[in-house]
């Protein structure tokens, strides 16, 4: 069977293309999972809390130069030092599931242009994150380094933003609990089914 690969990915540096392909596979697997109504509802709450926080942080300057002077890969771009992590770790199973069930689809995972070197997260570019806020992990939206905290404190916004961070953290915690409980059930279900079949065979003497 032929696998269709987006042209944009083929034009990416090999390391970024590989991370994008792995992330897309995981996202498709999560989208194919059977979930009850609670998990998508909790995921949407995470998305709403992310947007509420992100729209409250405007015109900050700390994020545009925080990586300057750092060793590679952090210092490859002037800003986004906190974005220099590994894509698969930033989009861990909980974060990716929250995105999937809030509406993120493979087509939403748009990388920066090829001219932006791959330096950390696959979506980190010279001008910032290539993803729309609703498609970013919660940890990316809620992270406040010392420089950013100092900036919003000087602007008198820190207390409000910390309250919004707490709301996002609570929403993500509730989703994480539901998601992990479902994953546990997925692991246990085949075991219980096998035990049930064994007991039935024993009862019938077959």
Where are these regions (language model features)?
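Hydrophobic scaffolds flanking metal-cofactor catalytic centers in soluble metalloenzymes
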Residues: 1-205
């Amino acid at each position: 069977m032929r696998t269709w690969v987006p042209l944009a990915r083929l034009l990416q540096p090999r390391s970024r293309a590989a991370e994008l392909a792995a992330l897309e596979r995981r996202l498709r697997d999560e989208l194919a999972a059977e979930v009850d109504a609670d998990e998508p509802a909790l995921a949407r709450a995470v998305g709403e809390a992310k947007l509420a926080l992100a729209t409250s942080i405007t015109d900050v300057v700390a994020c545009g130069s925080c990586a300057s002077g750092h060793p590679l890969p952090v210092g490859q771009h002037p800003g986004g030092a906190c974005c220099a992590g590994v894509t698969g770790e930033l989009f861990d199973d909980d974060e990716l599931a929250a995105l999937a069930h809030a509406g993120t689809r493979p087509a939403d995972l748009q990388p920066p242009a090829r001219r932006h070197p791959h330096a950390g997260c696959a979506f980190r570019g010279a001008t910032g994150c290539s993803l729309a806020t609703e498609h970013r992990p919660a940890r990316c939206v809620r992270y406040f380094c010392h420089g950013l905290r100092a900036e919003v404190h000087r602007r008198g916004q820190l207390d409000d933003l910390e309250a919004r961070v707490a709301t996002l953290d609570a929403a993500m915690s509730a989703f994480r609990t539901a998601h992990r409980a479902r994953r546990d059930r997925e692991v246990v279900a085949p075991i219980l089914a096998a035990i049930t079949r064994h007991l039935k065979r024993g009862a019938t003497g077959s």
